[in-house]
Structure formats: C-alpha cells, structure tokens
C-alpha cells in the first residue's frame, strides 16, 4: 500500500516551497502476518499527516526509520502509531550529516524498538514466510 506522496499536492516547507523530504514515498509491505513500513526521507510534517490520515493502518513489525535517522524523523507520536518491534536505519559510517541523530536514537530506545544500522552492521536482511520472521546482518 502506498500512503504518500499525497494526491492533493505537496507538503510545503516554512517558505511555502515543496519540501522533497516531506513528499517522500511512504509504503507498507504486508505478507501474511509480517509487515514493514518504508518511510523514505519523511520528516515530522509528513509523519504528522500520516498519523492524521492513516493512523490505524500504520502498525508494522518493522520500520525503515525515516531520513536515515535524522532528528526531524521518527517522532514519538509516529513511533507509537507504527509500534514496530525493530527499526532499520540506512546510513553511512561517519557521514557528514551526523545520522542517526542522538535524539532519534533516544526516542527509538524509549519505545523499546531494537535498532539495526547499516553503518555498523552492513547489509540487513529480513527473512519471512509470512508467519515468522528473522533478521540477519552482514557483520
């Protein structure tokens, strides 16, 4: 299921310009009892709109943490709507942006979400038969 971008147009930044990050493709993969929510570079504004318009549909076992774990993504209300068991952060080691943001990591920990990071664990693979699932990492 694709939840965003929105049919009625872009979410704009504070200057009224379309914000590419807040217009990321957001989709949910469901296979049997397994589900994963992919959030692209979605930030706070897009997360808030998802909560408002799709709240009951967001719950997923796995969350691809938005915007590489930036401070503008994975707000507490959004995490509580998704209720993931694990979060996957795709980021480079020692990247120029400081991803993942320490506050984002604290929010994930506060919600008891197990975090996997490509920077430290390499390729992250999730295997499922639709009933059970497990995670393997390269490192």
Locate each region found by the language model:
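Cap/insert and terminal regions of metallo-dependent hydrolase folds
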Residues: 47-122
